[in-house]
C-alpha cells in the first residue's frame, strides 16, 4: 500500500504559486526604473487627477454655480387631459386615481393633475390631486363635480 495522505506531505501544484515581483529592488529584473521607462511625468508618480495635457481642465472651464434652487422640492404631476377622461368614461360617473391606475392612464404613487385640453360632455365626479382652472370650469359646466385630494 502506498504512503498515506498526510497533511505535512501536501504541496501546491507545480506552477500554481508564482513568486511576487518586487519592483525597484536592485539591478535585476524590474530594478532601477521598475518598468516605467526613463524620466518624464509617468516615470515619477501618477498624472494628477483632472490633468488634461495642458488644455484648460473641465473643472476650471465650467463656471461656479452659486445660490439655491427649490427644483428638488417641486411637485411633478402626472397629466390627464379632459379628452382622455371623455374616452375612458364615455358614460360619465365617478373618476378616482385608483380607477385611472386600473385603466392604465396613470401610474400609482405619483400625484395626478387634470388639465383642460379637449372637451367633456357627460357629468363626471373627478377626484385628483390638482386641477387647472380651465379643467374645473369645463367639468362643472358639464354638470360634474371636482374634488381635490
Curated annotation (Swiss-Prot):
Start and end residues of each stretch annotated as Disordered: 1-52
Q: Which GO terms describe its biological process?
A: translation
- The highest taxon in the source lineage is Bacteria
Keyword Nuclease carried by entry: no
Query: What are the entry keywords?
Result: Ribonucleoprotein, Ribosomal protein, RNA-binding, rRNA-binding
Any one Gene Ontology MF annotation carried by this entry is: structural constituent of ribosome
Gene Ontology annotations for the cellular component aspect, listed alphabetically: cytosolic large ribosomal subunit
Q: Does the keyword RNA-binding apply?
A: yes
Q: Which InterPro entries match?
A: Ribosomal_uL15, Ribosomal_uL15/eL18, Ribosomal_uL15/eL18_sf, Ribosomal_uL15_bac-type, Ribosomal_uL15_CS
> Which Pfam family, just one, is annotated for this protein?
Ribosomal_L27A
Mark the transmembrane ranges: none
Family per record: Belongs to the universal ribosomal protein uL15 family.
Subunit structure comment from the entry: Part of the 50S ribosomal subunit.
Q: Give the protein's function.
A: Binds to the 23S rRNA.
Name recorded for this polypeptide = Large ribosomal subunit protein uL15
Source taxonomy lineage?
Answer: Bacteria, Bacillati, Actinomycetota, Actinomycetes, Streptosporangiales
